[in-house]
Amino acid sequence: MADESKFDQFKGNVKETVGNVTDNKELEKEGQQDKATGKAKEVVENAKNKITDAIDKLKK
């Protein structure tokens, strides 16, 4: 999942840059949305990992 979130962020960055260079506001906005989606996935994954770690520590 971490790879997917990083890929979404990378893809979004590329789209945003290309949109900016070509003055394509729609592509630029799409890139911003992809980056935000990737970041959200990363935050959720990190939270899940922290919760899992906390549960594992409580079990010991």
From Swiss-Prot:
Top-rank taxon: Bacteria
UniProt-listed InterPro entries: CsbD, UPF0337_stress_rsp, YjbJ_sf
One Pfam entry name: CsbD
Name of the featured protein: UPF0337 protein SAOUHSC_01730
PANTHER family named in the record: UPF0337 PROTEIN YJBJ
Protein family membership: Belongs to the UPF0337 (CsbD) family.
Region called Disordered, residue ranges: 18-41
Gene3D superfamilies (alphabetical): YjbJ
Biased composition (Basic and acidic residues): 23-41
